[in-house]
Amino acid sequence: MDRIPFQATAAGSPYESIGTLPAAVLLDNVRSMYNVGAFFRTADAAGLEKLHLCGITGYPPKRAITKTALGAEASVPWEHAWEPVPVVEALRGRGYEIAAVETSAHAVDLFDWQPRFPVCVIFGHEVEGIRPELSAMCDTHVRIPMLGIKHSLNVATAGGVVIYELLRKYRALSNPAAPLAPYK
């Protein structure tokens, strides 16, 4: 079986015209450096605009981040801020929709959500979730559908699911000639 070189997997595809996905991620008090590294790697792969690392969330240079990110920490724009509220206020002032990823009852199903780009998606602490004051600032709350009994995903895994759903939806908006079938 012939292997396609990794660098060539997007060549000539409907993704070429996208360039950068007009989306950012804000990590609020994500404690695991490995999760932070995984977000860097996913952000790089999906062409995410920026990572905002807030509170106790680790930031480069940290060995555990580098180990998981595999160099993506050098290619993805990022910034650290101890307080996330001013970051959210600045993003909102620049026209971003602010969305929290939570398992709350009032959250919209990820596959039904129609994000307004540019968008910033917030992920919180692995156990405690997003701070209430930050959650209250969000324009929308989004949940990933879960059929199992745990109703829980690792935060970096959840990030991958949400980021790639954003890419799918943005591709359909930016390249109508090659839309993906909507979820029904």
What are these regions (language model features)?
Residues 1-184:
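Post-transcriptional modification and biogenesis factors for structured RNAs
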